[in-house]
């Protein structure tokens, strides 16, 4: 039987002060989305509401579906459906600037390579609150590649979050 090592990303492979990270992240998102009529305070409050719902996910839906269902309750199904591409654009174009709120762990790549050389299955078990695009971006900030891991948890492929036992 092959054994696995599960690594966390935020604060482990990718050093960060979570408060600074969140402030930078939400500030950039609010600025970007305000040009599409989103009120910054309402948007951030809605994101926290969706995040809270994801953390409480009972496992029936993916974390992604739980988040966007919550978002739709505030902004409506049609607007949510139409604007999801705008959020994807944010993650492609603006989210990379959030790297300035993170540090760098020079041993991260070496740790992952060593674990794989020892025959371990290597999983990035980061709390799946983010879409794949944002998680993969943060993996790159850590000097790693998504392909360094057998599995990377994201809100698209997960039905629960830490510390839920379903995770």
In which residue ranges do the predicted regions lie?
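Active-site neighborhood of HAD-like aspartate-dependent phosphohydrolases
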Residues: 1-49
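Short, surface-exposed alpha-helical segments at coil->helix boundaries
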Residues: 23, 65, 132-137, 165
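Short helix-capping segments at alpha-helix termini
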Residues: 34-40, 78, 143-148
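Substrate-recognition element of Asp-dependent hydrolases with the DxDx(T/V) motif
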Residues: 89-92, 96-104, 108-142, 152-153
